[in-house]
Amino acid sequence: PNGDIYLANGYASNHVFRFDKTGKYLSHFGKQGNGLQEFNTCHGMTLDTRYEPPRLLICDRNHQPKGRLVHYSLEGEFIEEVITGLGMPTSASVQGDYVSVPDLHGRVVILDKTNTIMAVLGHNPDPAKGGNFNIPQDQWIEGVFSGTHGSYWDREGNLYVQDWNVSGRIMKLVRVQP
């Protein structure tokens, strides 16, 4: 909200760095590990505006067991472990009371404001293809993912999903009105 910039360094130190809007270093938090307040590949994060005040929602991709999301304050204070067992969560995107969480194993999980799983989209039931970035284009299946890596909501509530693949693929999932 004030222009601060946060950067996750999940492939090295597992720190989350905080800079002001001019790029001046302010602080960092986190360290490598598998404990409650440690990261095992802090991969993606977003400003979780489902709460007041907003907080950071961080994807801890390789945390055991099976990946998790955690909340931290904007000052870097641990708030809570949000949910575990998400596979390999790579990023998160918020729209209204919902958050989409791509899982590198080949699916997107939708959580509500209570962080209950509301839907699992595009799940790839083939273990040889879920989490595999080298699926030939002629084997792609519409609406089924191989290794989701990013997602973004548009104003109408449609969800764009980036599937990590050697050729690259973006799918638009159109929101269905009940």
Residue positions per predicted region:
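Beta-rich, blade/repeat-based domains predominating
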Residues: 1-4, 34-55, 63-67, 85-98, ...
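Structural signal for glycine-centered tight turns and loop->strand junctions in beta-sheet-rich domains
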Residues: 3, 14, 23, 43, ...
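Conserved beta-propeller blade signature
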Residues: 4-8, 55-58, 98-101, 109, ...
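Short loop/turn segments immediately following the C-termini of beta-strands
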Residues: 10-11, 50, 61-63, 104-105, ...
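A short loop-to-beta-strand structural motif that recurs across blades of beta-propeller domains
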Residues: 14-18, 68-70, 107-109, 169-172
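Short loop/turn segments that connect beta-strands within beta-propeller blades
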Residues: 20-24, 73-77, 112-116, 174-177
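Surface-exposed loop and turn segments in beta-propeller and other repeat-based domains
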Residues: 24-40, 119-143
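Blade-level signature of beta-propeller repeat domains, shared across WD40, Kelch, NHL, RCC1
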Residues: 144-178
